[in-house]
A protein has these predicted regions:
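Detector for methionine-enriched segments
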Residues: 1, 13, 53, 57, ...
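Catalytic core and acceptor-binding pocket of nucleotide-sugar-dependent glycosyltransferases
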Residues: 1-55
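Generic marker of "main functional regions" within proteins
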Residues: 18, 25-27, 67, 143, ...
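Polar low-complexity intrinsically disordered regions enriched in Ser/Thr and small residues
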Residues: 32-35, 69, 126, 151
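Polybasic, proline/glycine-rich intrinsically disordered low-complexity segments
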Residues: 34-92
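Juxtamembrane luminal stem/stalk of type II transmembrane Golgi/ER carbohydrate-processing enzymes
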Residues: 78-168
Length: 168
């Protein structure tokens, strides 16, 4: 990136700054989150036309809602393999169903209450990241696993029990 910046400055190439192509951190503004504002919470996990979605999802955070969670450092190391199950997908209405999150932590319960915008953003990232990771794993399994040996079960979660405390 540094070399690119030097070359652009040296050649005096004009640029326009675009701030709406990518989303990454649900807690901050200034990203492409405005593209999601008109989508109802109950539909945030549904497929929308690509033209209405952020172009890039930067997977640099942990995403959570209810007990649904995805974090790249917590993802099992052999996730892309023949043996590993696929990630269990959250319900399509996850952003209208939950307003808080319980993060997976073996030592203590970490509970977070989320604001209205955060719920929609976390729901979007959670659904679409899990879908993308599963698609990558399925592609690997289809291409590299012997017939009948790949695990296509959607059963991998980060909590042993997916029930929220008020559901117990």
């Amino acid at each position: 990136m540094f070399a690119y910046n030097l070359a652009v400055a040296h050649l005096e190439m004009p640029h326009s700054i675009a701030r709406s192509f990518a989303v990454s951190d649900p807690r901050v503004g200034g990203e492409g989150w405005k593209l999601l504002e008109n989508i109802p919470d109950s539909k945030i996990c549904h497929n929308y036309p690509v033209s209405e979605m952020p172009h890039v999802m930067h997977y640099c955070q942990r995403y959570y809602l209810g007990k649904w969670f995805i974090g790249k450092y917590q993802l099992r190391k052999d996730f892309i393999s023949c043996e590993a199950p696929l990630l269990r997908e959250p319900p399509k209405n996850v952003a209208s169903k939950y307003k808080e999150a319980i993060l997976p932590n073996k030592k203590k319960v970490e509970r977070k209450v989320l604001g209205e915008k955060e719920v929609k953003r976390y729901g979007f990232m959670l659904c679409h990241m899990i879908e993308a990771l599963n698609a990558a794993s399925i592609y690997y399994k289809d291409q590299h696993c012997e017939k009948g040996t790949a695990n296509y079960e959607y059963s991998y979660t980060f909590h042993e029990d997916m029930k929220m405390p008020d559901q117990l």
